[in-house]
């Protein structure tokens, strides 16, 4: 397999217009790349739209049924012969130079098994999406404890905050990661044993990238975030997909942490004994229509504003800024789709949770773009 060309794969599910934009960005960044679109829609109208709208150099693969994200990627990989495979969500786009930066990182370090760009939530590149967090059996149990204890919630949330800050500020060098998001990732195929699929098809959606990350690490390969490479991912909150996530989580824990399933028993006992806290970080309600947060004077040289659908602020979207005011991204908050948004403001440097300002705000749904979530990884 050669290194001179990259195979880029986009999985489509009834969102052709988004897929066109994703493919356009890939070709604008690297015209010689091999583009493969795998359509999971099982819909003749969607297939016709893809045939009519995709550029001639893009290969279209029609799946006979909706086989899920990971299996569709595996199907697309069969169309390429390159060692490097770029995976991109249809609701994502790469910025110029992204593919070259990722390829250069893999070229320069044979121990890297996969790399990802820094993903932004907006075209102005102010809001950064969270780095992936590798789930483990003990980690899941700790998360359940955090839902039931303000002290545990504070400690775990701060640990994730520091993890995110390291990823968001390390823009000059590769930042080592324990896991990467499959929504925008370049993988070295030769990092896996011959004959082993990139993704385990047991995962219909969610956790397939966690599974891949864990396997690559067990094969002695490293993972990294390449801050000089950038992508746009128009993520939307999709609470209706929670059952899919729970099903995949069970498969993941059974596969990798079978010997540690006592953590699951501990979780079940904990759940039965104590219900989760509704507001573990004591978030304060924002005033209706509020557009700015006042930044305390000691933080005005550099602050971090985070947004999250979770009261634990895990994971969170971040914006690094300075000055006396932090503006709330009201248009972007519509992507929370009628779910509360939790906000946290604090200095960029490491600090105690008691020093941070945490808020909760009601959001409004943006029905005009409701199709985005159907394509989300």
PLM ranges: what are they?
Residues 16, 25, 38-48, 65:
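A conserved acidic beta->alpha catalytic loop
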Residues 24-33:
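Short, acidic, metal-binding catalytic loop of nucleotide-sugar glycosyltransferases
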Residues 63-80:
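Glycine-rich, basic loop-to-helix element that forms the pyrophosphate-binding segment
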Residues 85:
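Short aromatic/hydrophobic "clamp" motif used to bind/position activated sugar donors
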Residues 97-130:
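Conserved donor NDP-sugar-binding/catalytic core segment of glycosyltransferases
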Residues 134-177:
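Short, flexible, basic/aromatic active-site loop/helix in glycosyltransferases
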Residues 168-172, 178-229:
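A short, conserved alpha-helix in the catalytic core of glycosyltransferases
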Residues 210-286:
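Active-site-adjacent helix/loop segment of glycosyltransferases
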